[in-house]
């Protein structure tokens, strides 16, 4: 079995087992050798604290891509054991996130708020059809003519959109054309007509009586009075 070579310390480990490697890496000599290695590398590259930020540009990115260890840690370039070994037990959150929001009617209303309705209306609580967008004929110029929905009573799905609206329309029609009220109004109109006819007949009778009195006065003779005289033209003069 080949021995493990430490490039920082420039030595071969006597015990190349994982336990021996871990003990060497955590040792004080290895840490000091590693610090000295990077100091020498920065000195060779001419990197100082003054130009360190400028070094982090494209040159640093290219050096990172040139390093095989850093290239393996780039997004989408995970090693095979990381793709299939280390991540097989971690599922993506978005694939199962909908499970946290689906109650399926198993929990009470007080505990889960708006997620407490049954699964029958969970995915689509409001089933809107093409007829629900327009205004009904009874509300074309009404209060709710400019709104998206026809009225607040029409916001129920599953074929029950316009039950309340139809009920309101029917009630309005019943109020406008009530047979009892129509019959009462008809009776009032008939009574008024009878009263008008009877009053007209009385007026005609009164006119007839006046005509009879006038004819009788025309055919009557001269009128005589104790204090006055009548001339030939039926003119009556009264002495003062």
Swiss-Prot record:
**Identification of the protein by name:** U1 small nuclear ribonucleoprotein C
Compositional bias (Basic and acidic residues) at which positions? 178-194, 203-219
InterPro entries cross-referenced by the UniProt entry: Matrin/U1-C_Znf_C2H2, Matrin/U1-like-C_Znf_C2H2, U1-CZ_Znf_C2H2, U1_snRNP-C, Znf_C2H2_sf
Q: Keywords, A to Z? A: Metal-binding, Nucleus, Ribonucleoprotein, RNA-binding, Zinc, Zinc-finger
Give this protein's Gene Ontology molecular function annotations. mRNA binding; pre-mRNA 5'-splice site binding; U1 snRNA binding; zinc ion binding
Pfam families xref list: zf-U1
Role, per record: Component of the spliceosomal U1 snRNP, which is essential for recognition of the pre-mRNA 5' splice-site and the subsequent assembly of the spliceosome. U1-C is directly involved in initial 5' splice-site recognition for both constitutive and regulated alternative splicing. The interaction with the 5' splice-site seems to precede base-pairing between the pre-mRNA and the U1 snRNA. Stimulates commitment or early (E) complex formation by stabilizing the base pairing of the 5' end of the U1 snRNA and the 5' splice-site region.
Residues in Matrin-type zinc fingers run: 4-36
SMART domains (UniProt xref): ZnF_U1
UniProt-annotated location(s): Nucleus
